[in-house]
Amino acid sequence: DSLSDIVGGIWKLFAYASLRRQFPIEPFYVDCEAAPLSKGGSFIGHHIMVPKEGVAVHINAFNFPVWGMLEKVAVNFLAGVPAVVKPATITSYLTEVVVREIIASKILPEGALQLICGSARGIIDHVESQDIVTFTGSADTGKMLKSNKRIVEEAVPFNMEADSLNSSVLGPDVEPGSPEFD
């Protein structure tokens, strides 16, 4: 059951890594050309993307302990933003194995990826406006987290994927040994 989670997560990480080649080797990214905003060009607009100076906190669901983490942290690494990952406790052992291997590889700066297994009560009580929080799980828990005083007062970006369903429905013609079954 974990194969698609692990392989899918690694594939996602590689897909994002390939996007990195499109970025310049700079601590910022200039998006498109400057746009004239006034007659005669005396006032222009230009989008310049810079990384947040905070941390990304990712609170993940039980069903994709590897994929869920890797697809979220991949964009952090592209932006130079460190990540704190809080997987669901019940499947955190898979997340922990992958994080351990990433850290052992020394491919990231020390502290760029951190993991909290078990209770993380209060994890978002210290976030600030330069941080970001993502949550995957139940809508009720997500709403509770999104209404956290710090999230609201600091206007912390909060991204929630809630109550998603993943299923496979096999027809009566699918039997053990068929590709769909295996």
Regions found by a protein language model. Give the residues of each.
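A structured beta-alpha segment of the ubiquitous adenosine-cofactor-binding alpha/beta core
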Residues: 45-46, 113-134
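Hydrophobic packing residues within well-ordered alpha-helices of enzyme cores
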Residues: 13, 95-98, 126-127, 145
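Beta-loop-alpha module in the N-terminal Rossmann-like domain of NAD(P)-dependent dehydrogenases
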Residues: 56, 63, 117-125, 137-142
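Long amphipathic alpha-helix in the N-terminal Rossmann-like dinucleotide-binding domain
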Residues: 1-42
